Amino acid sequence: GPGSIAGTYMEALKGSQTVKITAVLGHREESAKAFSEKYNIPYYLSTEQMYNVENPDAVLICTPTFTHGDIVKTAIDKGVHIMCEKPFVLSAETAQQLFDMAEEKNVRIMVMQVVRFWPEYLRIKQIIESGEAGEVTNVYANRLSAHPGWCSWHKDPQKSGGGLYDLHIHDIDYMYYLFGRVKNVYAVGRQTETGCWNNVSTIMNFECGIKAVIEGFMDITGEWSFSTNIRINSTKMAIEYLNKRVYNSKATKEKVENLVIYHKDREPEIAAVPQYNPYRAQTEYFADCVTENRPTDTVPCSDIVYILKILSAIEKSLETGLVQNIE
């Protein structure tokens, strides 16, 4: 797919010695040709022609969510390894079926949950798991965005899953990555006229005893720039990562991005976090796993199935107003 996220990967992979994008497949010639010319790679409008001519080792699926299933099935039939943008599909059952099909054909699949590779989020995980923070006492995160105006399918919950599956999934996934299995969830939100849950606030109750409040809004009014924030309080420190653009005194947008550690017994510090492109990191990670014949432990398929179960429970809580247990 020659869309915006595909362009993000193309920019990220410039100069990579591990991964080379050899072609783009699209369904509209105008966009496919423009992408082809921008990145100097051939384009195809025929799936069969692309596979026959290019004979790829892997495909990177950057198409609308509702198209993922059929594209994945075709790649499995061709014996081609698969990287797929999130959300993979919109149900745990469908995801499990596709993963089972891939396993039978010895095809690797990794869903691109990029937050697991994000430098600051990865540093937070390292701090928590090392015990440096002490006991975690409360957790809050948000991910806020105006609604994407560049497509119509995003407004159809049967095609996109709405903000719940497209945006909120990032922080739900990351919280599970940090704290493990979830006991139950409770959520409140606002549903659009078309049925999308684009405004969601979720309370996650983890089996380990930690509770987290997560907000995902894809309906912010006005010229709101995409922003993320996570705050973890613990017995030894408070940790906050903020990434947003704010208006300064000159009424121009100024980017604020830092990971601050507020120590209990000394002055706060801005954490030194080695910077790299997380989109490149996750793509090269998958390529290394395939070539070295090792599992994609950072994003196992079983995690994707579990996250989709959590999202389904959140959706049911939104609809019923009740706490939902996770199987």
Segments from the language model and where they lie:
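N-terminal Rossmann-like dinucleotide-binding module
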Residues: G1-Y39
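Beta-loop-alpha module in the N-terminal Rossmann-like domain of NAD(P)-dependent dehydrogenases
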Residues: Y9, Y39-M101
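A short helix->loop->beta-strand "cap" motif at the edges of active sites that frequently abuts
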Residues: I41, K78-V80, K105-R108, G209-K211
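Hydrophobic residues in well-ordered beta-strands that form the structural core
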Residues: L45, C84, I109-V111, I214, ...
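Rossmann-fold dehydrogenase core element
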Residues: Q96-V114, G134-V139
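Predominantly a Rossmann-like dinucleotide-binding segment in NAD(P)-dependent oxidoreductases
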Residues: V115-T194, V200-I203, G321
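Contiguous beta-strand/loop segments that form the cofactor/metal-binding neighborhood of enzyme cores
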Residues: I172-K250, V273-Y276, R280-P295
